[in-house]
Each structure stands twice: as structure tokens, then as C-alpha cells.
Amino acid sequence: VTVDCSGYPKPDCTLESFPLCGSDNQTYSNKCAFCNAAVERNVTLRHLGEC
């Protein structure tokens, strides 16, 4: 599973809840929060859902 993070980082994310687990073992609340971290800190997707 991959997530398209083109167009990120974004200054504001919605409060939409769609958890994603990052390679840093942190649960991100949604795609926007995950993609901001992916772009800024080179985090990759571990799996969909909470870590």
C-alpha cells in the first residue's frame, strides 16, 4: 500500500480520522498529517490503521 504525498507539506490539516501507521511507529490521524511527516522527516507507511 502506498500513499501519494505529492503536494505536501500543507500548513493545515483537517480533523478527518483515517489513521495511518508510520515507519517511526507513530500513528498519524489522517493522510495529511502522515504526508507532512513523510515529506519533512522521510517517514514511510508501515500499514493502514493505528500502530
From Swiss-Prot:
Cited InterPro entries: Kazal-type_SerProtInhib, Kazal_dom, Kazal_dom_sf
Glycosylation: residue positions: 42
CDD domains in UniProt: KAZAL_FS
Pfam families attached to this UniProt entry: Kazal_1
Top-level taxon of the source organism: Eukaryota
Site (Reactive bond 3): 15-16
Keywords from the named record: Disulfide bond, Glycoprotein, Protease inhibitor, Repeat, Secreted, Serine protease inhibitor
Disulfide bonds: 5-35, 13-32, 21-51
Keyword Magnesium: no
Start and end residues of each Kazal-like domain: 3-51
Location of this chain's protein in the cell: Secreted
Alphabetized Gene3D superfamilies for the sequence: 3.30.60.30
PROSITE patterns: KAZAL_1 (PS00282), KAZAL_2 (PS51465)
A single GO cellular-component term on record: extracellular region
Molecular-function annotations in GO: serine-type endopeptidase inhibitor activity
Entry remark concerning the domains of this protein: Avian ovomucoid consists of three homologous, tandem Kazal family inhibitory domains.
Protein name: Ovomucoid
